[in-house]
Amino acid sequence: MASLINIGVSGLGASQSGLFTTGNNIANADVAGYSRQQNVQSAKSSIQSGNVFIGTGTTLSDVRRVYNAFLENQLRTTTSLNSDASAYLNQVSPIDNLLSDADTGITGALKSFFTALQSASAKPTEDASRQLLLTSAQSLSKRFNTISAQLNEQNSNINGNLASMAEQVNKLSATIAQYNDQISRVSAVQGSPNDLLDQRNEAVRQLNELVGAQVVEREGNFDVYLANGQPLVLGKTINTLETVPSKTDPTRMSLQLNRGSTSMDITSSITGGEMGGLLRYRSEVLDPSMNELGRIALVVADSINQQLAQGIDKNGEFGAALFGDINSAALISQRSIAQAGNSAGAGNLDVTISDTGKLSTSDYQVTFSSATQYTVKKLPDGDAQGPYDITATPLQEIDGFKLALNGGAPSAGDSFKITPTRNAAAKLDTVLTDPKRIALAAPLSAVSGSGNQGTGVITQPELTSKLDIYDSTQRIDLQNGLKYSTPVKLVFGDETTNPQSYKLFDAKGTELSSGTIIPGESNTLQLSVPMVDASGNPIMDGVTQKTFNFEMTVAGSPKEGDNYTVSLTGAGSADNRNGQAVIDLQTKATVEVGANGKGISLTDAYGKLVENVGGKTAQAQMDSNATNALQTSAKAGRDSLSGVQLDEEASNLIKYQQYYTASSQIIKAAQEIFTTLINSL
């Protein structure tokens, strides 16, 4: 009887364990990372009875996790990829909308500015149209400022998110190390701790949501490594992540791995997870977009200011700048960042924009090999240019900018990050406040002599000597020369000779130059005028008198004595030729201008930026969809094996209930047999 009762009791125990395991599966059905468990039963040792062996019941040999390491690793990998793609998409989508939308992007503001410029140029004497142009210029500069502010805010958010995620990574690393410790201790004496193993797996999966990590199982422990092979967790030991300002750019946070007393920058090697997506977005979209937007802002300010300086305003004065000076003392000092660790006596570098048409959208690394010699490398992986001499005259031009020392001399090994265009959009401002100061008129105007008899016709003179707003000496000399060396008079000789002669005289009647034309044809005259100051003294360039040059076309047949007077354009002129020249900047190749003079326009440059960001956004959406599908598939694969199927567990409940009832019947039968036996005595 004892054997039959023991068999029944073993069945009761096994069925009860089955009910416990099934109930535990059902209770944890929605717990992330939980692997369903199965009871593993085995028959107890049989006993010999005569020449046969009779069973003695069952025993619970194990409660097994239904687990597959390959499926778990696949889920971790796809989780990392999807988190990366989602983080990237979440960052790039709003910027794509910002740049491409007509109400928030630059295209609409740029179009409105040039439309207002066309109106002002069509009515150069009206103050209302000039005021509208000023308002449009202010709107344009504010639009640049607003977009730049949002890009900078996004950078700040990325910095904050990286710091927060680094803390989460450290907490998860510590959790994994604790699980390693607990699992090692429990496994040594009590077998496999299923729930701890599941919880450790889930912690690793959550870690992969933040950063791509690989697991190597060693003696029951999980060693966790980053993509570059640097360890986060080694058994019970963890290495911590920390965000610190980048040594080359303190406005960008970098990631540092702390291993005991040593630290290393691992920013460039972080891939996967939200961190990888944020860093990838920052390097692929955010920084290039800020640089491109800044380059466009620099070209807008420089090209428009340069052209307006060539003209005459409504007051009869030389043109004033519409936008702020792109090479102000404050701006040239903000384009260079001294690397942390430079020698104590080293100052910084001043970065002067010398040719906006040659600017790229890259940042640069400048490294000194001595106090004066340096090389320049286009980031992130360009070839080194140079060496150059920082004290050379003139200064070396590099992709449209020049470098000069600001402060103490550097030492060998000192390095600087150069950001020629990074902050330009934020600094663009409209400085002109008086609409009368907008220089829409060309500087020189010509009138025909009142007594002219011939059929000669001239075009208005075009000043071919260009004023440089960044060279104060050249600018002042040319303005004085135009002001005090005019008017000049062009007088034609005997019309019966062919070619017909002409002479150019100054205001005192002194002959300046002479030449000939072919009567009846279109003749382009290139004329040069020696420059004098307000006192009539020559304006000199060393030992040579400076001149300004202009050209005009003469057609028809002038009579002898016919003349044309070329003067500085006066106040209130209806001339709009300089305004038209500014309008032409809308389509003129002013960006990425190569040695052959070919480039792209402002509108095309911004369109290229929008197209690039739009392309990145479209690719990010496809990547997000693809990685989401992969993650969903990986999770489904894992859940199909390890997940709790409630229908199956409900069936198991019924099975174990029946098992329990049947086992109790065995005991009941044993009791009845025992009772019958007792009663028969």
Positions of predicted regions on the chain:
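Structural signature of extracellular appendage/secretion-system components
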Residues: 1-681
